[in-house]
Amino acid sequence: MFSDERSKYKSWGNLKKQMNNLLCDALKNKISYFYTTYREVHNTYGRATINCERKELVAFSWQIRYEQWEDEYKILNNTNVDIQHLGSLSAVWERQKQIQEELSKEKWMPECILCDGDFIFAVTEYLKTNITSALNSDNYILRVFAYMDRRVGKRTLIKIKEDAEALPEWVKQFYLIRCEAEGL
């Protein structure tokens, strides 16, 4: 999921403004987004958060993601990829990449072990995605943004209740915050 989107956008201020403009009226002064990079640190690592009334609800940090990469590396080394069966080194790399993507999607997304790059990737993706696709996305960060979006009305919130309640707690909390703000 991680993509180096940091090099593809002009400024965080512009993205933040666009995201704030998409917040529903009930959440305008409650929800805030934070993102920073530490330019003096190797690879300009950073930190991103989504806050509600100045309380940090979820954080995306390179430190957490680094621990994830270590775990994935250990799993990949213990995964038997049959080199002879796949035929070429590029096929082996492709299979390892596929295994890594499966690990990331299945384990790390539900546990919210994501980095600042995942957050920026999700923001830039969200701004290009229609609201229906975001509400049904496998990317939980896109769903979080969609739950707080002004384009999602009360009827839609009621329709997606069962789906939202089956999601991990860190995602569900944003659905509940929106419903509470709307009086549902």
Regions inferred by a protein language model and the residue ranges of each:
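Alpha-helical scaffold segments
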Residues: 1-184
